[in-house]
Amino acid sequence: GVLDAFRKIATVVKNVV
């Protein structure tokens, strides 16, 4: 769902930072 996509993106951003 939308929340899953958002959480996935947030995880990627967190990994990059």
Swiss-Prot record:
Pfam family, one: Antimicrobial_8
Top-level lineage group: Eukaryota
GO biological-process terms attached to the record: defense response to bacterium
One Gene Ontology term, aspect cellular component: extracellular region
Major subcellular location class: secreted
Location relative to the cell: Secreted
Keyword terms of this UniProt record: Amidation, Amphibian defense peptide, Antibiotic, Antimicrobial, Secreted
InterPro entries per record: Antimicrobial_8 (IPR012527)
Tissues expressed in: Expressed by the skin dorsal glands.
Valine amide carried by residues: V17
Function: Shows a medium antibacterial activity against S.aureus and L.mesenteriodes.
Annotated protein name in UniProt: Uperin-3.1
Organism: Uperoleia inundata (Floodplain toadlet)
